[in-house]
Amino acid sequence: MKIKVVLPDGSEREYEKGTKPMEIAREVGIKKVIGAVVDEELWDLKRPLERDCRIRFVTLEDPEAPEFYRHTMAHILAQAVMRLYGKENVKLGIGPTIENGFYYDFDIRNGKLTEEDLPRIEQEMKKIIKENLPIEREEISKDEAKEIFKDQPYKLELIEEIEGDTVTIYRQGEFVDLCRGPHLPSTGVVKHFKLLSVSGAYWRGSEKNPMLTRVYGTAFAKKEDLENYLKFLEEAQKRDHRKLGPQLELFMLNTDYAPGMPFFLPRGVIVLNELMNFSRELHRERGYQEIFTPLIMNEQLWRISGHWDHYAENMYFIEKGEERYAVKPMNCPGHILVYKSRAVSYRDLPLRFFEFGRVHRYERSGVLHGLMRVRSFTQDDAHIFCTPDQIEDEILGVLELINTIYSQFGFTYRVELSTMPEDHMGDEAIWEKATNALKKALDRAGLPYRVNEGEGAFYGPKIDFHIKDSLGREWQCATIQLDFMMPEKFNVTYIGPDNREHTAVMIHRAIYGSLERFFGILIEHFAGAFPTWIAPVQVAVIPISDKHSEGAKKVATMLSREGFRVFLDDRRETLGYRIRQAQIQKIPYMVVLGDRELESGKLSVRTRSGKEIKDVEMDHFIDTLKKEVRDRKLELTLEG
């Protein structure tokens, strides 16, 4: 039987059904091919073609290539572990690719796998790569698969859940794995890899299941790219907020009594307050009204909103007598109650309610991660109630506010617009009008954006912002979401010029997103060296010796009265030690005082980078810092 195949150049050829992409690549003279894309599905070179299709080929230079070679590297890792620890002692979990790498989960019986073992595992992987074992894909019956994996309980569990009568397996040498692919043609294609770490991971992410050993790794087509990535990881580890947070006395975590619920220490609270004050100032200027809504509300509210039916597994509940309450996972129902507390005319719109609202959402312990993934967090949530004709201008206002806030921290960002999914509520004409309003607002703001067709929420289109930090990593933070569902569920209306009730449009919007997460991003973005305006301590006053302490106290008091956050370090430690401690604490400025300074009334100032400025007039120092703080400058003025 013949099938028609459209080639990369657009030409069409006929081949026998079962022809492999490798054979077509060889025939048309395309070299250095490692895989294929068949009708937008990643496809092994040795996997037969069964239908009419369009094909293009993947080389190591193509963006699809990492999915092939990192997936294969995960299998090479598993094969190496089984060789070293014994096939009978290793129970295999799963081994997928992830962003910039891969991992494999193992249940090691009669032994233990730690980070000290990674070098010898790497050596065994290099042997497997050198062996250049052919990788073969097979489709077999479930019964055959159960026989092959009869000693692999986790694989048997997966086989039971696969729909249909057949499954796919991959073989390389003595190693066989249950897998959908895709993979390289052999183990010797990519040689540049590194095993990175070992951690615990519950099977399938559930605390009810056994804890497995997860080994993380990365791989690249070029040695240079691997080396650059390892340097990037080294820098990222230095900036890790989980390390810097406690070191800088910003926050702490207690997994025994409050997993996923950060404790903010005095210095961390200063940063949070500065972030909130900055945001409040901008919101007041733009006509937002700040409100506070209850943390706990009756279950009936959450039944109306739909959270009870669709989000209950992520919520916390409280029962008291006959009543049942929920700890709020979102702020929107509370804001709707505020809106509905009085009659609203079209003349009152738009109404912009804003809240730093604490919410709680259950997350599995295995996915909790410092401040980035938590169970308790604060959202800078706002809800705008407006008429359909006001959507475009309101979105434009939010875009301007987002840009103002992100620019203040030196962030650039990327924008995505997600449109109507197949499963949606509301009239398609309303969706089209709303989506066009979002597009027009983005165009008027001059923002380039990518459209994600069909990726909107079922209750409305949305705009997402991905900020880029100093290491080039992207973080999804701000969201603008149009909602057609909540206003209908809660009968959110206004009296129009025709004296009739009309359903209001509701715009959800957050900019920091989670205040805690944004704080964590800032720690890593600035490596803990915050701009002076948000630095927990702005000036460290350091007397050279005990006899200079009284003079140092007077200087510290004077600076404090001028509104600066000052730390007087008059401990009986060496001067060098105290200066180093101030630098470790990332304090922007150090004022060092000895005989010369106290007699002249002029300051010796050091910046945290080590720059020294002598004979600084007190008034000049105060005026310079005040302007730096008032203008919320990113750089230290005295370093310029």
UniProtKB/Swiss-Prot annotation:
This is Threonine--tRNA ligase. It comes from Thermotoga neapolitana (strain ATCC 49049 / DSM 4359 / NBRC 107923 / NS-E). The keyword Transport does not apply. Residues 1-59 form the TGS domain. Keywords: Aminoacyl-tRNA synthetase, ATP-binding, Cytoplasm, Ligase, Metal-binding, Nucleotide-binding, Protein biosynthesis, RNA-binding, tRNA-binding, Zinc. Residues 240-531 are annotated as: Catalytic. HAMAP family: Thr_tRNA_synth. The gene is thrS. It is found in: Cytoplasm. Homodimer. Its main location: cytoplasm. Its EC number is 6.1.1.3. One of its GO terms (biological process) is threonyl-tRNA aminoacylation. InterPro entries: aa-tRNA-synt_IIb (IPR002314), aa-tRNA-synth_II (IPR006195), aa-tRNA-synth_II/BPL/LPL (IPR045864), Anticodon-bd (IPR004154), Anticodon-bd_dom_sf (IPR036621), Beta-grasp_dom_sf (IPR012675), TGS (IPR004095), TGS-like (IPR012676). It holds the Pfam family HGTP_anticodon. One of its GO terms (cellular component) is cytoplasm.
